[in-house]
C-alpha cells in the first residue's frame, strides 16, 4: 500500500486541518481524538509518511522509532494516565481495523478500558 498524502493525518500535520494538540516534537504529533471511545482518547502519529506499523518498522530510522515510543510515554504522562494505567493500541490494515492510512497509536485511559478483545 502506498502512502496517501491526502489522508486526514497528513493534512493535520501540514496544518490544513486543526487538531486539539497535546504534544509535538520533531518526531511526533499527539492530539485528542475527535470521536473519543473512552474518557481519554488521544492519537500519537509519527511525522514521517508511514502507512502502518509494518511500513514504519521496516523504513523508519532508529531515531524515529525511539521518538515515537518516547512520545507515547510523554503523552501518557501529560494526560495523567501513566500512573493509573492506560491502553496503547495500533490497528494495522483492513483486518486490524485501520481506518486512516497513516500510522497512529491510540491512547485510551481515564477509566477502566475493559478486555483487550471480546
Question: Could you say what each language-model-derived stretch is?
Answer:
Residues 1-118:
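HIT superfamily nucleotide-processing domains
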